[in-house]
Regions:
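Active-site neighborhoods and metal-handling regions in enzymes and metal-associated proteins
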Residues: 1-611
Length: 611
């Protein structure tokens, strides 16, 4: 099995580690320290050796940070993780609502004038540090760069990952690495830039048509790179990871320790490789990289990572791969949902029957594995029953594993990594008869999901413009959810990909080929969680009859699996909403029936019957 269920942290471990950290800070004459979740690559997924926040606090969520002071430790988490943080962390760590509470404001209130706060410049971006310093202006509180303080205390810290790198075939990528490098290099040259420093492994893997095995759930190699305006690439990674793999001409593999010296030769008075500034993305770059370049007198230009938008706009080959992956994944989901319905009926008839969250996660992984094409999960399966469903990113462990009960809602958010695509799907399933409140909230969430699915919009519209469509039915009922409506999704890369999002803060215009999730939800702490998620691909839309001859866009739904009709209040749906759902279910049945067992096919026919 790919997913394990042993708890990796214990609340009791936090207080003695916090005490040791405070002693180390006191010895260095600093009054505080920043402990981020991020590693040097600033990604969502980190290797076990980089789980510093979890080691200190016990919190295992994918986003957050801790500010340690002599008399308090604030754990900053967003709305997805507030319940989880309270469950995983000792009382020595105080959850702080973020981003509602800004770190600078918290420090101003908590620290005396003259306090010095330490941080590791490899683990924070220039954007983060500039924002914090601006917020602390005139407070008397200063930031100080320090060697990593957690690493000095973590005596049994695991070693760095050494997964093998493989080629990603051009027939799946749609473009050769040479074509991609030429395209990005030309953009640099057109902007008068000499090079760009690439610090996000997903960008490098996309650019070079390679995939790695350094991280669970994310098929990347941990590496840094420098792309020059003439198309050359210096790739800084351990040679042992590339055993037997021949890189393209113009791609030079160099050891990780050569990265800093290479930065010092990029563009400065001492030596210039090419004329023009070095392009840096200060939202994802380690601050230390910028510091090194400034030490050499290099000229820099702050712009977005030039690989992000081309990577987000999938080629026709990548879209075809995504459709194939979703057919395969949809068949696995149907087999799983058929199995779960059978088990749920048995549970209702025989209350002594035992069915747990781990049973569900294991069964779903087994169903996906039957295709023999599953490389990995795209994230640890979220299998939250009853009150655990209200923990947005709940990860079941042997300690938290809950027995399902009749009347529960079962929220299952899962996905697979296949060589031709990445999937992410959420279904909320009734375990026996559901309550009136559960059905009402499910219907509101469904209406929001359908609104995004049916959206037609002119070119130039961003995800921030569409986010409210998914929330509006909930808003009318005085309800909402504390996460974005959707995130970008990669092509056998990260299940969470930018820069596009369906979120009220997103300003990135949507464009053809962008794949996003569509996943509104509703969570009632202590009771239940509801989320319905499909992946959608942005495509060119038809001009409505009698409409303006504008450049319209719309969404193609990629995900294929029934939505639990037992939780739908049919009379609450409009005629258009019912028509969309019936058409979606008809398509699901047509495409998946040939791919599933006879038993699952019969179940699918019932699950997809018109409302």
């Amino acid at each position: 099995m790919l997913q394990t269920y042993t708890a990796t942290t214990r609340p009791a471990d936090g207080p003695p580690r916090l005490h040791a950290l405070r002693a180390a800070l006191s010895a260095q004459g600093v009054q505080g320290y920043l402990v981020p979740r991020a590693d040097v690559y600033q990604g969502e997924y980190v290797a076990p050796c980089d789980e510093r926040l979890a080691w200190l606090t016990g919190f295992t969520g994918s986003a957050g940070f801790c500010i340690v002071l002599p008399d308090r430790a604030g754990l900053f988490v967003d709305g997805r993780y507030r319940v989880q943080a309270r469950m995983q962390c000792a009382a020595d760590f105080t959850p702080v609502n973020w981003p509602e509470t800004k770190p600078a404001a918290w420090l101003r209130e908590a620290c005396p004038n003259g306090a010095v706060i330490g941080f590791d410049p490899w683990l924070h971006t220039p954007d983060e540090v500039e924002t914090l310093e601006k917020g602390l202006k005139d407070s008397g509180i200063t930031l100080k760069r320090l060697p990593n303080q957690i690493d000095a205390l973590w005596t049994d810290r695991p070693g760095p990952p050494m997964g093998q790198v493989t080629a990603h075939p051009e027939d799946l990528a749609g473009l050769s690495s040479e074509e991609k490098r030429r395209q990005i290099a030309q953009a640099l040259a057109d902007a008068g830039q000499s090079a760009t420093v690439l610090t996000q492994p997903e960008s490098l893997c996309w650019l070079l048509n390679i995939r790695g095995a350094d991280l669970p759930r994310l098929p990347v190699v941990q590496a840094f790179g420098i792309l020059h305006a003439d198309g050359r690439v210096d790739l800084f990674a351990h040679e042992a990871k590339f055993d037997g793999l021949v890189l393209d001409e113009g791609v030079h593999l160099r050891p990780p320790e050569a990265f800093e010296p290479a930065l010092r030769t990029l563009n400065g008075p001492v030596r210039r490789t090419l004329n023009g500034p070095v392009r840096l993305d200060k939202t994802s770059l380690p601050l230390r990289v910028l510091n090194i370049l400034r030490e050499t007198g290099a000229e820099v230009a702050f712009m977005q990572d030039p690989c992000l938008l081309p990577k987000a706009r999938k080629t026709e080959a990548e879209l075809a791969g995504a459709r194939a992956a979703h057919l395969r994944d949809g068949a696995a989901m149907v087999e799983f949902l058929c199995w779960l319905d059978t088990k749920a009926a048995q549970l209702v008839a025989e209350p002594e029957h035992v069915l747990t969250e781990i049973d569900i996660a294991r069964q779903l992984e087994a169903m996906r594995g039957r295709s023999n094409e599953l490389v990995d999960l795209s994230f640890d399966t979220i299998a939250g029953s009853g009150p655990n469903g209200a923990i947005v990113h709940y990860r079941v462990t042997e300690d938290s594993n809950r027995r399902l009960l009749p009347g529960d809602l079962m929220l299952v958010d899962s996905g697979g990594q296949y060589r031709d695509g990445t999937t992410d799907i959420t279904r909320t399933i009734a375990i026996g008869p559901a309550g009136a409140l559960e059905a009402e909230c499910f219907t509101l969430v469904l209406q929001g999901m359908i609104a995004i699915s049916r959206a037609r919009f002119p070119r130039g519209v961003a995800g921030g413009h569409l986010d409210a469509l998914a929330r509006y039915p909930l808003w009318l009922a005085g309800r909402d959810y504390d996460h974005g409506t959707g995130h970008g999704v990669g092509a056998f890369l990260s299940v969470h990909e930018g820069p596009q999002r369906l979120s009220r803060v997103s300003t990135v215009p949507l464009a053809e080929g962008m794949i996003l999730s569509n996943e509104p939800g509703y969570y009632l702490e202590g009771r239940f969680g509801i989320r319905i998620e499909n992946l959608i691909a942005t495509r060119k839309g038809e001009v409505p009859e009698g409409g303006d001859a504008r450049d319209w866009l719309e969404f193609e739904t990629l995900t294929l699996a029934p939505i639990d009709r037992r939780l739908i209040l049919k009379d609450r749906l409009s005629r258009e909403e019912r028509a969309w759902l019936d058409a979606y279910h008809a398509r699901v049945q047509t495409l998946l029936t040939p791919l599933v067992s006879p038993e699952a096919g019969q179940w699918l026919e019932r699950a997809c019957a018109p409302l």
